[in-house]
């Protein structure tokens, strides 16, 4: 066969049958470096949105309302603790941004990168410690087998009023457990760019007033798409 390689313009390989490709001698590659800045910035944007009611307040105004008192109890990010689950390129970018605005940052990853704690001033901690200490939790791990990383059991270990951000893979967060926690107030708000089903079908979740949502646009910037194109050319030129 002349079919030698599949290149995914982005990070995730969810829409590629990797095992089939491997069995048939077809290489599968992606462009993991290119979208990091854009995805990290979107995660940060969702953090601000959740802290200050930006999404729901804007929607309210478009309905002709002026609900200043309803959205008068926002919170600052400065001084809060951000826990990053998955400390690869995107997690590291977000960690640097968060530290720059005065947040305390901790990280969990099953793989520890030598020297990165000292370089960034961001310590690795165990998952339970991250859950207990974090005011904001942002997920940047690849999809995992065996269930969601953020499930009902782990949400129960979080601070009351925690904010959860997911710009990684929709299956990393148990949507039913998240919705229950939003309704109970255990979770203050959630910022979501990815969903278990895409296009998203969980209307109750993405229409919740305390959910800041976007339709999987993490890498959808002019700059990221330009870098992805360059990375594609680089990969092809080395084949």
Show which residues each predicted segment covers:
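N-terminal Rossmann-fold NAD(P) dinucleotide-binding loop
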Residues: 91-92
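An N-terminal-biased, well-structured beta-alpha scaffold segment characteristic
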Residues: 1-29, 132, 151-153
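A short helix->loop->beta-strand "cap" motif at the edges of active sites that frequently abuts
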Residues: 2-5, 24-27, 103, 160-162, ...
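Phosphate-coordination loops involved in phosphoryl transfer and adenosine-cofactor binding
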Residues: 3, 78-81, 152, 161
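Glycine-rich Rossmann-fold phosphate-binding loop(s) that bind the pyrophosphate
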Residues: 87-88
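C-terminal helix-to-coil terminal segments
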Residues: 22-23, 27-42, 56, 67, ...
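Phosphate-binding beta-alpha-beta segment of Rossmann-like dinucleotide-binding domains, i.e.
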Residues: 24, 32-81, 96
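Rossmann-like adenosine-cofactor binding region
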Residues: 110-204, 220
